[in-house]
């Protein structure tokens, strides 16, 4: 489906949920994904199925800066002065680079698939040990921001999440309804306006 088609599917699902309709269950046979009592999947988006999404988390990182170079330098006073000045410049660059890398920023990860349920968002994320499922409970979401095909979720106790891709507006519509209920239109105003004008 095209990006435009995915957008209109998001508008359609937003309108359906706003009118009180219930989404049907989507079968999911994924090892590691264990739904809670009463929880069921309503959408599955896999890179291999033609619905790729990108995934990033916003946080600071621990960066270790290690001094390199010889411990003992021998030479004329001019050579030693030049060496010390050059070393100071290189160390300054290395410290600035380490600070830049350690600063809070969006840090992307590989994302294999995303499952949207009635209670949580599940993401199969690439780690150093392969792929691992992480989930985000809707009741922990304090802010949902949809800008085009990018969704930013802010949580009570964990770092923010950024998803991007053609099907992200659909995910945003569903998450907004399960998290905010009747106030969902306030969380996804673009979808709500589009739903009002298309009906």
Where are these regions (language model features)?
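Acidic, Ser/Thr- and proline-rich intrinsically disordered linker/docking segments
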Residues: 3-23, 28-42, 47, 53, ...
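Mid-length scaffold segments of soluble, non-membrane domains
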Residues: 114-116
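Short, hydrophobic/aromatic-rich segments at coil-to-beta transitions
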Residues: 118-120
